[in-house]
C-alpha cells in the first residue's frame, strides 16, 4: 500500500486549500450509498418478490412493520437525493476539467451506468402500474438489437413478457448491484488519490496543501448534515414528492397508463429516446446520452483546464444545464406538439455541447495567443 493510501485511511491526506463546496458531493454520495444499502436491507427482509404479493408487501411495510414507513420513504427519497448529488458531481467535473484525470473519470462513468441500472431495477420492485409499464417499455428496447434482439429480450424477461421471473431477477440484481457500486467507489477513490484532487483554478495544488482533517472533514460534515435536513424535511412534509400517482395502483397488464414515464432522474435520457422516431436510433441516443461523457478527456483542446477563466466555455456549460432541465421537463409531457419539437431541439443542443466544447477550446487558444 502506498503512502498516499496510508494517509487516506488515517484521514490526514494533504488536499489543496482552495477546493470549494462543489468538492463535498463525493462524500455526500458515499453517505447516500451507505444509507441506501442499510435501508434497502431492512426493506428486503419484509419484501416479497412475487407479482401477486410485491405490491401488498410494500403496503405491509408501510402500514404494519414498525418504522417501515420511515425506511421506505428514506429509501425512495434517498434515491432522488443520490441522483441530485451525482448530477452536481458530474457537472462539477465538466466545469472544472476534472475529466483530465482519465482513470477517475472512466471509473466514475462506470459507476453512473451501474447506479442507473440499480435505480431502474429498484423502480420496478413495488409492482405498481408505472413500475410495470416502465419495465415493459425500457426492457422492450432490447428488441432493437439487430438479429439477437428478440432472443436477448426473452432471456432477460425470463419468458415471453414481463412476469414473475423478471421481478425476481430484478430484485436479485437490485440487491447485489449496490455492493458492486461500493467496490467501484473504492476503486474510484483510490484512483483519485493516486494523483490527488484538483481545484477550482485547475492548477497544481502541491504548493498549497493542508490536511484533509479537520479542515475539509468539517466541511463534509456540514454538507452531509444539510443533505439529511433536506431529506427529513421532504420525508416529514412531502413524502410522496418524487412518487408517480400511477404507482399507487397495482400493476395491471390490461390497462396502459395514459403517459408512461420513468423516475424523474431518468427523464433526460428518456426525453432523448422519445425525440427520435426510430427505435434503434432512439435506443442508441439513449445509451449515448450517458456514455458520451467518456469522450470528454479526448476532446479537451483548451490550454486552460478549468472553465473558471473561460467565459465562452461557461456560457456553453450553462446552456448544457438549461438543456438538461428542458429535456427533463419535456419528457414529463405527452408526445404531441409543441413538446416533440422542443424535445428534439433540446436533444440536439445536449449532444452539440460535446462537439462545440473542443471547437471553443481552439477558438479560445487562438484569442489567448493573439493577446499574448
Swiss-Prot record:
It is found in: Mitochondrion inner membrane. One of its GO terms (molecular function) is metal ion binding. A ubiquinone binds at residue 193. Its main location: mitochondrion. GO terms for cellular component: mitochondrial inner membrane; respiratory chain complex III. The cytochrome bc1 complex contains 3 respiratory subunits (MT-CYB, CYC1 and UQCRFS1), 2 core proteins (UQCRC1 and UQCRC2) and probably 6 low-molecular weight proteins. Belongs to the cytochrome b family. This is Cytochrome b. The gene is MT-CYB.
Amino acid at each position: 500500500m502506498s503512502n498516499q493510501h496510508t494517509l487516506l485511511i488515517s484521514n490526514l491526506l494533504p488536499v489543496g486549500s482552495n477546493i470549494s463546496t462543489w468538492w463535498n458531493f463525493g462524500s455526500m454520495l458515499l453517505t447516500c450509498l451507505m444509507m441506501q444499502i442499510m435501508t434497502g436491507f431492512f426493506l428486503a427482509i419484509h419484501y416479497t418478490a412475487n407479482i401477486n404479493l410485491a405490491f401488498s408487501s410494500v403496503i405491509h411495510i408501510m402500514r404494519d412493520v414498525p418504522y417501515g414507513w420511515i425506511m421506505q420513504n428514506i429509501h425512495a427519497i434517498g434515491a432522488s437525493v443520490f441522483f441530485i448529488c451525482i448530477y452536481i458531481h458530474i457537472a462539477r467535473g465538466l466545469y472544472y476539467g476534472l475529466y483530465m484525470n482519465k482513470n477517475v473519470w472512466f471509473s466514475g462513468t462506470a459507476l453512473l451506468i451501474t447506479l442507473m441500472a440499480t435505480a431502474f431495477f429498484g423502480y420496478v420492485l413495488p409492482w405498481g402500474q408505472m413500475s410495470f409499464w416502465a419495465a415493459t417499455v425500457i426492457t422492450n428496447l432490447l428488441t432493437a438489437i439487430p438479429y439477437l434482439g428478440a432472443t436477448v429480450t426473452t432471456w432477460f424477461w425470463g419468458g415471453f413478457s414481463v412476469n414473475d421471473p423478471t421481478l425476481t431477477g430484478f430484485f436479485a440484481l437490485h440487491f447485489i448491484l449496490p455492493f458492486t457500486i461500493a467496490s467501484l467507489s473504492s476503486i474510484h477513490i483510490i484512483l483519485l488519490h493516486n494523483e490527488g484532487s484538483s481545484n477550482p483554478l485547475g492548477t497544481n495544488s502541491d504548493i498549497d496543501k493542508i490536511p484533509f482533517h479537520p479542515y475539509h472533514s468539517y466541511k463534509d460534515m456540514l454538507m452531509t448534515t444539510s443533505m439529511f435536513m433536506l431529506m427529513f424535511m421532504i420525508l416529514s412534509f412531502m413524502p410522496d414528492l418524487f412518487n408517480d400517482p400511477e404507482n399507487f395502483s397495482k400493476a395491471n397488464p390490461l390497462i396502459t397508463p395514459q403517459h408512461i414515464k420513468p423516475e424523474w432522474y431518468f427523464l433526460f435520457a428518456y426525453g432523448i429516446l422519445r425525440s427520435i422516431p426510430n427505435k434503434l436510433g432512439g435506443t442508441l441516443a439513449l445509451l449515448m446520452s450517458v456514455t458520451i461523457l467518456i469522450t470528454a478527456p479526448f476532446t479537451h483542446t483548451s490550454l486552460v483546464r478549468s472553465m473558471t477563466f473561460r467565459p465562452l466555455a461557461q456560457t456553453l456549460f450553462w446552456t448544457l444545464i438549461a438543456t438538461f432541465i428542458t429535456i427533463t421537463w419535456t419528457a414529463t409531457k405527452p408526445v404531441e406538439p409543441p413538446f416533440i419539437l422542443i424535445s428534439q431541439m433540446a436533444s440536439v443542443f445536449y449532444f452539440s455541447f460535446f462537439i462545440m466544447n473542443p471547437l471553443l477550446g481552439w477558438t479560445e487558444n487562438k484569442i489567448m495567443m493573439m493577446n499574448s
